[in-house]
């Protein structure tokens, strides 16, 4: 199906890993190599899934993770990209574009955007990733704020101190 959809305008193949399952990345990468295409994985619904001993999001040129409220790792907004060392993409350029085009402090080499996640949201994502990777998240069935588990996820971090404020 993928090869039949490739045209002269095609620049990338974007497989979407769903329900903790990883697409057949060896086959997809082989097709991409044959046609000189980039592979960009959408890994939002398969955080922590593996194939051939490698994590989803690290099986191609670029892995993307959404942290939107319905995703496995949830910070209400934002996301993350991963660029493996063997990627054909320019990781320093991508990093600069996500950081307002800066290649170093006050040096803007590219037209860029502010795609930086706020530090408290990074902490939330990091906390959930740690729980998820150690199996605690799946055992507890943590999913989101409706479960009332964010205080546990956030306050379990040494960098965060809970204020002793009551509702009085």
For every predicted segment, state its role.
Residues 46-52, 59-162, 168:
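Active-site region of PLP-dependent enzymes
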Residues 1-75, 80-88:
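Active-site phosphate-binding strand-loop segment of PLP-dependent enzymes
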Residues 20, 164-165:
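Glycine-centered secondary-structure boundary/capping sites
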């Amino acid at each position: 199906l993928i090869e039949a959809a490739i045209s002269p305008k095609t620049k990338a193949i974007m497989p979407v890993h769903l329900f903790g399952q990883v697409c057949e990345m060896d086959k997809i990468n082989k097709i991409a190599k044959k046609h000189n295409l980039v592979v960009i994985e959408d890994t939002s619904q398969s955080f922590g899934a593996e194939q051939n001993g490698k994590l989803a999001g690290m099986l191609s040129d670029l892995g993307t993770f959404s942290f939107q409220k319905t995703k496995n790792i949830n910070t209400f907004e934002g996301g993350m990209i991963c660029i493996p060392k063997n990627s054909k993409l320019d990781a320093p350029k991508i990093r600069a574009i996500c950081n307002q085009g800066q290649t170093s402090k006050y040096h803007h080499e590219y037209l860029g955007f502010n795609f930086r996640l706020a530090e408290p949201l990074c902490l939330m994502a990091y906390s959930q990733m740690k729980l998820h990777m150690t199996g605690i998240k799946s055992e507890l069935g943590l999913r989101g704020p409706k479960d009332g588990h964010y205080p546990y996820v956030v306050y379990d971090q040494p960098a965060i101190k809970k204020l002793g404020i009551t509702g009085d």
